[in-house]
């Protein structure tokens, strides 16, 4: 039997309710109360931790990310600091010179919106060829929805002047009618598979690296889509199941498993859905409807304000999308669909309503839910559709959303507080590695709606700023609700999992600008201390 008593603390129980201490026993919260009550209940055999007045919150539960890719990114070329394509070429050449055994160059860290004003352009196959023509080169945009690749990858994909169609994707052509090496959506996803695949041992190493970083920053659950993202599902499954069977993974894991077509949907339900190994389980089916705002591949009903001819990429035909949603509904499987643009959100939530009515008993979810108008938000509430927000996206998006969407639509988007006030179940995640998976940085964005430089001074559309308590609830209780675990996860109450974080500063009373710099001093998962500063 393991027992731990935390005392002399500020324990967040629920909105407006705090305690001084708690007792966990064998992975469950046994009691919450005063320091005296807990110490008298703990007994001689409990580990007793004096928190020195520090704040304790439930463990953060990232409701959508890609944790395998986070680990990969820690080992791969980082061009996030490059301010031109030419700098990326130089960085790529340097990386290969330092890593002569590299069999395929992969990165997903550049952002053209951060390029120097006189050097803003997208890379193409010629730029990638300038890095190497001997091995596959994949330069992915930070959003994960577009990429430049070299001629070798185009050749491996069989793309040329006469063959340049990929269902659910776009292959950009140059003036000569040949693919210029820039790919969107399903086309860039297929190109990733041309990079030599990781082994099971590679995947296990990447998982553990990313999870170590996660628990050091207070994450205790990851709801992650890794299924076929950067490795075949067989590799992903074997790595995960071996880690969790051996008890080596330090956090809980819920698989949001990508299904791009009906065949994959049938295979997922037949082979994996609902299966558990230790602290991991296979959960929702993840679908994709559109792309990203930054790459202008998010589906916009009326096009982009700064590019009216662009309306985004529809990644799945409506008849196939509806058939898959209906299939999952019939099997009792939660569907979580990537939708960023208002066009994607509108189509998808109407399909949810068509198959699930207003009850939505399987809690189908829209991931991202960025560009909306109030009629769409009301529809979401009326049909009990769940939302997974990534407030940390505002670090970048607050600088581009009005130019992409126009002022009026932008002011109805990223509507965190409105969704809360309407009673929509909205959870928080990071979509990492698109953004850092640090929960405190994410909370900062939800509460202040500013970038890390504190701009704009009043916050972007400050009417949608969240209170700290509501933001913490979205990151804990609501994330648990999305996985049907709200009765055992996301609160520090008797009968709940002993997943918690001790913070070095009181996020409920400190200057909101300081939240992003707050750090955990201890993280507990399932009653076990997995990180201690």
Protein language model regions, located:
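Divalent metal-binding segments
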Residues: 3-7, 15-17, 23-268, 292-327, ...
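Short aromatic-centered micro-motifs
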Residues: 23, 287, 523
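Generic beta-strand/beta-sheet core signal
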Residues: 32, 140, 224-225, 254-258, ...
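An anion/phosphate-binding loop that grips the pyrophosphate of nucleotide cofactors and donors
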Residues: 63, 383, 498
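Non-cysteine beta-strand/loop elements that form the S-adenosyl-L-methionine
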Residues: 66, 279-297, 385-395
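Acidic (Asp/Glu)-rich catalytic clusters
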Residues: 244-247, 271-277, 359, 380-384
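His/Asp/Glu-enriched, well-ordered alpha-helical/loop segment
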Residues: 326-336, 343-364, 369, 374-378, ...
């Amino acid at each position: 039997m393991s027992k731990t008593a935390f005392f002399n603390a500020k324990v967040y129980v629920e909105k407006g309710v705090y305690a001084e201490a708690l007792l966990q026993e064998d992975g469950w919260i046994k009691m919450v109360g005063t320091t005296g009550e807990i110490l008298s209940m703990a007994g001689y055999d409990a580990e007793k931790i004096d928190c020195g007045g520090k704040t304790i919150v439930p463990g953060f539960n990232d409701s959508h990310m890609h944790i395998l890719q986070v680990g990969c990114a820690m080992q791969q070329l980082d061009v996030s600091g490059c301010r031109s394509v030419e700098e990326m070429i130089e960085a790529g050449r340097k990386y290969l010179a330092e890593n002569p055994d590299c069999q395929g160059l992969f990165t997903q860290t550049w952002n053209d919106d951060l390029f120097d004003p006189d050097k803003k352009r997208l890379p193409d196959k010629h730029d990638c060829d300038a890095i190497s023509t001997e091995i596959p080169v994949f330069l992915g945009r930070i959003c994960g929805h577009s990429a430049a690749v070299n001629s070798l990858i185009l050749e491996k994909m069989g793309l040329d002047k006469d063959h340049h169609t990929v269902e659910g994707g776009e292959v950009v052509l140059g003036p000569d009618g040949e693919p210029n090496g820039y790919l969107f959506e399903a086309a860039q996803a297929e190109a990733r598979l041309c990079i030599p695949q990781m082994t099971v041992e590679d995947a296990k190493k990447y998982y553990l690296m990313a999870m170590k970083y996660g628990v050091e920053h207070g994450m205790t659950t990851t709801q992650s889509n890794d299924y076929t993202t950067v490795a075949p599902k067989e590799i992903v499954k074997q790595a995960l199941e071996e880690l969790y069977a051996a008890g080596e993974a330090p956090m809980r894991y819920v698989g949001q498993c990508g299904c791009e077509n009906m065949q994959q949907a049938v295979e997922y339900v037949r082979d994996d859905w609902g299966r558990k190994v230790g602290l991991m389980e296979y959960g929702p089916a993840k679908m994709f409807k559109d792309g990203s705002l930054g790459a202008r591949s998010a589906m916009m009903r009326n096009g982009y304000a700064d590019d009216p001819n662009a309306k985004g990429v529809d990644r799945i035909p409506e008849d196939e999308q509806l058939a898959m949603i209906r299939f999952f509904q019939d099997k009792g499987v939660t569907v979580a669909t990537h939708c960023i643009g208002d066009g994607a959100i509108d189509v998808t939530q109407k399909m949810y309503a068509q198959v699930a009515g207003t009850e939505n008993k399987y809690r189908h979810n829209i991931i991202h839910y960025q560009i909306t108008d109030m009629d769409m938000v009301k529809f979401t509430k009326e049909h009990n559709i769940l939302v997974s927000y990534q407030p940390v996206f505002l670090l970048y998006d607050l600088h581009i959303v009005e130019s992409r969407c126009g002022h009026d639509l932008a002011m109805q988007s990223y509507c965190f507080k409105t969704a809360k006030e309407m009673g929509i179940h909205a959870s928080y995640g990071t979509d990492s590695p698109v953004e850092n998976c640090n929960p405190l940085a994410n909370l900062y964005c939800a509460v202040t709606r500013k970038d890390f430089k504190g701009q704009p001074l009043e916050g972007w559309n400050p009417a949608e700023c969240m209170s700290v308590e509501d933001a913490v609830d979205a990151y804990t209780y609501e994330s648990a609700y999305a996985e049907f675990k709200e009765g055992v996860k996301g609160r520090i109450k008797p009968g709940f999992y002993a997943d918690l974080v001790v913070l070095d500063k009181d996020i409920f009373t400190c200057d909101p600008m300081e939240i992003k710099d707050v750090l955990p001093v201890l993280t507990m998962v399932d009653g076990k201390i997995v990180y201690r500063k």
